[in-house]
Amino acid sequence: MAKPLLLVALGGYRAVDEVRPVSRQHNVILVLLLALATAAWAVLVWQGHDVSMPMASPTAWGLDALLFLAMWVVMMVAMMLPTAAPMVLAFHSVHARNHQPDDAFRATWVFVAAYLLVWALSGIAAYAGVLAAAAAQPMLAAEVNGLILMVAGIYQITPLKQRCRSECRRPIIMTSWHHRTADAFHMGLLHGVYCLGCCWLLFVILFPLGMTTGAMAAVTFIILGEKTLRRPEFVSYGAAVVLVLYGGLMVVTPGLPAVFGFFGRLSEDVWFRLGLVVWIIVLFIAARACTHKSG
């Protein structure tokens, strides 16, 4: 009788030893994700009103393109990593059940890299669109900007948006799980594509809103709410109403001032205080979502 109990005890200790590295990795991944996002937001806030300069007035596929894409990647890291953290941690938890901790850790970052690659590539399409608009007309008319906001608002309630939002919220491990580490790249791409389908027009509206940090923060909160709250349709429909109404006002009132324009005139001290409060809220929401999804 003692021998089986001893084996059970040893097995229990071994199981605990196997779980501890996974738990530590879980925490390390969360800290690194939020640290990267924090650093990216610091860059955006430090740039202040100059963020829009390399992103709103490109001239050719050269240095301007590189500057645009670099700032686009920073923006994606700042805005999308906090919203993707729950899915990343869920991926790591499941992968760690069938692989060694080190393999699960590497696969998780392959998943993250593939996810960010989708958003980085979307920057090429965004640059091409801005370049075409700049060639046609130096500054988009207020009416066109208003129509862009209205289209983005209408998209919020379309079946395609709802399907992509549902797939973006649903753990990919439930539908497309593969045990090989190499497949982590494919799963990251797939998750990125669904998130792109869900959020792409929310990034398009940043251009008519002036690419201000305030507009980026507002869009981040919309995406975070759509991906983490229990009733995401309230966020989507609320954003739809605001975008359609504000876009309509821009169409009928061309001289309407930009709601987010004043953010670019805030002092560094105000930005620091505002950013600290906002980031605490983002961290709280992301941490709650991560705990819920990984559990």
Where are these regions (language model features)?
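Histidine-/acidic- and/or cysteine-rich, low-complexity loops and terminal segments associated
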Residues: 2-74, 97-100, 137-139, 162-178, ...
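Juxtamembrane transmembrane-helix termini in multi-pass membrane transport proteins
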Residues: 4, 10, 69-116
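Membrane helix-loop-helix hairpins that form the core translocation module of multi-pass transporters
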Residues: 19-50, 105-160
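Hydrophobic cores of alpha-helical transmembrane segments in multi-pass inner/ER membrane proteins
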Residues: 81-83, 146-158, 216, 275-286
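C-terminal ends of transmembrane helices
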Residues: 85-96, 157-161, 222-230, 285-293
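A small-residue-rich subset of transmembrane alpha-helices
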Residues: 101-131, 198-250
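Membrane-interfacial entry segments at the cytosolic side of transmembrane helices
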Residues: 136-145, 232-241, 269-272
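Membrane-interfacial catalytic/cofactor-binding modules of polytopic membrane enzymes
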Residues: 159-201
